[in-house]
């Protein structure tokens, strides 16, 4: 049978399953597709199809990720599930699979484990907006008090990492029962209840086009008699001819006016998210703008040099470093379209960072970059990628 075409008349949302190894993330993913397939909202994808996820490259890093899609009455979802813990770390840090929200899977039989904690921390650091919880394997626990205890532990852990632990919906069930068609109240019905909480609790993300205008500068030309043209792909928002914009990063911020927008050599009255455009800037000299700056809606983005980041350092096999690095490491940080040198300070108690580690670190750049939380970057040495990171918070 041919692939069903999903009707794109529902709002779209990207989610994923996170949590400790063997707590049932992949079983739950399979169970969601099985239960929603009954109402035509999904094609059932079996556990072993999801588990042998294909490898993908994101920013030069190989990541195994499985993608399934399904829909509820309310939304259309793209759902990511990773086979290994390292894949989650890489995925969340590189933003390879954007997550607007996540389902944290915790085994009721084991309670929160080290990767439960690490995935919650990563979700906080990389800016996953909302989590819901599925307490799995409740068929293996006879003691109701034990279930309450695990729920309490999970809520405390969420609160510790600045998620609203008291308010986050927790659904108790068994992915295996749902897959095997047993005990519907903890199987089939629990999966439907979980999807209701995902629908209700994970906020609908804003579409890129509705956000404030931003375009990274890729190239700058001067056209005699017309002025300076800046080219790039609009990252978000809309820019209209005649609008005032700011040029931010690397140099002091300046204001200018967009006097023309062209795409494929045709003049347009606006450029929007996803468009590759040339923007003609009034009274701007060719040497006033350079690659690595951004054009943006005035006041929407500020230039910064100091930030806290969550980073993943590539292994030797991934083409990364062969040796550890220490505080005062000075690589290049590749933001959007350019490299800027920065100095790394490791957290108290972290002596060094080995290839294959993920780490929270402080960075100070030698030149300011238009920056905000959740912005992704690559860490490079002489043009070779040795790591990937995300801005967790801005220091100054």
Curated annotation (Swiss-Prot):
Chief location bin: cytoplasm
Alphabetically sorted, this entry's keywords are: Cytoplasm, Elongation factor, GTP-binding, Hydrolase, Magnesium, Metal-binding, Nucleotide-binding, Protein biosynthesis
Subcellular location, in the record's words? Cytoplasm
Q: Which GO terms describe its molecular function?
A: GTP binding; GTPase activity; guanosine tetraphosphate binding; translation elongation factor activity
Q: Where is this region: G3?
A: 81-84
Tell me its EC number(s), please. 3.6.5.3
Is Protein biosynthesis among the key words of this record?
Answer: yes
Coiled coil segments of this chain: none
Q: Where does GTP bind?
A: 19-26, 81-85, 136-139
Residues annotated to bind Mg(2+): 26
Q: Which reaction(s) does the protein catalyse, per the Swiss-Prot or TrEMBL entry?
A: GTP + H2O = GDP + phosphate + H(+)
| Record GO cellular component, one term | cytosol
Q: Which CDD domains match?
A: EF_Tu, EFTU_II, EFTU_III
Is Cytoplasm given among the entry's keywords?
A: yes
So what family is this one in? Answer: Belongs to the TRAFAC class translation factor GTPase superfamily. Classic translation factor GTPase family. EF-Tu/EF-1A subfamily.
Subunit and interaction comment:
Monomer.
Q: What name is this protein filed under?
A: Elongation factor Tu
- Look up and give the organism this protein is from: Methylocella silvestris (strain DSM 15510 / CIP 108128 / LMG 27833 / NCIMB 13906 / BL2)
Q: Which gene encodes it?
A: tuf
């Amino acid at each position: 049978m041919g692939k069903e075409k999903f009707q794109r008349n529902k709002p779209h949302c990207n989610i994923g399953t996170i949590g400790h190894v063997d707590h049932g993330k992949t079983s739950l993913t399979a169970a969601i597709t099985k239960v929603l397939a009954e109402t035509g909202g999904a094609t059932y994808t079996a556990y072993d199809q999801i588990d042998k996820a294909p490898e993908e490259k994101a920013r030069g890093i190989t990541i195994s990720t499985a993608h399934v899609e399904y829909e509820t009455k309310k939304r259309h979802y793209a759902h990511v599930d990773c086979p290994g813990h390292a894949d989650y770390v890489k995925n969340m840090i590189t933003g390879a699979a954007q997550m607007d929200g996540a389902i944290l899977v915790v085994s009721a039989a084991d309670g929160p484990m080290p990767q439960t904690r690490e995935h919650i921390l990563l979700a906080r650091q990389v800016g996953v907006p909302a989590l819901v919880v599925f307490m799995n394997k409740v068929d293996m626990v006879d003691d109701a008090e034990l279930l309450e205890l695990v729920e309490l532990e999970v809520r405390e852990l969420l609160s510790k990492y600045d998620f609203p632990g008291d308010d986050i919906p927790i659904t108790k069930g068994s992915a295996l029962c749902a897959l095997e068609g047993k005990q519907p109240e903890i199987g089939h019905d629990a999966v439907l209840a979980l999807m209701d909480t995902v629908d209700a609790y994970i906020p609908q993300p804003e579409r890129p086009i509705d956000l404030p205008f931003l375009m990274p500068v890729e190239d700058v030309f001067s056209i005699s008699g017309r002025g300076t043209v800046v080219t790039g792909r609009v990252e978000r928002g809309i820019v209209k001819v005649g609008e005032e914009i700011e040029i931010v990063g690397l140099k002091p911020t300046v204001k200018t006016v967009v006097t023309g927008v062209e795409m494929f050599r045709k003049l347009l009255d606006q450029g929007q998210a996803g468009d590759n455009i040339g923007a003609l800037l009034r009274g701007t000299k060719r040497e006033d703008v350079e690659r690595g700056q951004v054009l943006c809606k005035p006041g929407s983005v500020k230039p910064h040099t100091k930030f806290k980041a969550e980073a993943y350092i590539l292994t030797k096999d991934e083409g990364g470093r062969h040796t550890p690095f220490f505080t005062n490491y000075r690589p290049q940080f590749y933001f959007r379209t350019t490299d800027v040198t920065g100095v790394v300070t490791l957290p108290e108690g972290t002596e060094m960072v080995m290839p294959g580690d993920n780490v929270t670190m402080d960075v100070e750049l030698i030149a300011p970059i238009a920056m905000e939380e959740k912005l992704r970057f690559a860490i490079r040495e002489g043009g070779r990628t040795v790591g990937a990171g995300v801005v967790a918070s801005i220091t100054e």
